[in-house]
Amino acid sequence: MEQNYTIKLPPKDKEISLKKFSHKGWDFYSHSEYMMNSVDLDLLCKENEKSKLYIDHLPEVFYGYNRLFLVNESKNFCYEFNPLQFMSLTRYDIRKKLYDNKDIYYIPPQVKVQHHKTWENIKIEGRDDIKRIEPTSDWSFSSPYLGYYSSIAKSEMNKFYPSIKDDKIFNKKIGEETQGIVIPLDKLRPENKIIEYYQVEFFEDELSDNGISEGKIRFRIMNDCFYGLMRSYVRVDNVLIRNIDTRIYYGFGDPYIIRNISVKEMSYEKLTNMGFSFSNEWNMSPNQSDIVGQYMGKPLFEINDLVYL
């Protein structure tokens, strides 16, 4: 059963409509719309704004009002996928803090453009009009964001569940080692019919004509489970391809959500040696990250964990 709900979101308390779908004790809310306009983007960059991102620059196309929420009222549990949160993890200081707290498992290394040495070797001594500025965020928008979960009371969903006032039910627990518990791939076969599907875009950017970076989540609900793939994809032309993937799986009735976090990264040179063709057709494909991912072999980094409800 689908219904429509509205909430107000920063940076200017814009009212957006959420599509709701309920199944087996879970409520799924989603919103997808066009990119933020220049007024909204300016507000995100304004000093003293509560929603300010404090990153060096924003992507060219930013879907800042898009959202996906997975809510279980009986468990007082909300799992949120939010473009603002995704983008905040391009900041070096936030990454370090979350990594030190074991809220994320991986920090992507900085990537440089093909001709970076030309710029780095420019001599600026004696040039008062030129200053080197140390970046505070990742220019490629690589993000180790895993989504964010909390009690319903602490989420943007609290207005829809007024009877839940506190965190007494919710108890955050993560099992870093799943001890052989993995996402059951047989549940993801075509025979397991999809009853609801979302694709929620976060952003797109052409990296000043040096490639492309994008973030999105694809999410599906089957009768007996749900599954999502969130990806931070970066292509720096003639340098490298990087996929940072977070997969989440839940079998209805299970005591936990299974997560798989993996990173694949490979240079253009290695991909070429493996027979991959950087064709114009591939370059224009909306599925280029999936296509090239098949050539990238085993993950550079991978970990499974369990989010207990």
Identify the function of each model-found stretch.
Residues E2-Y54, L58-P59, F160-L229:
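Negatively charged, low-complexity tracts enriched in Asp/Glu with abundant Ser/Thr
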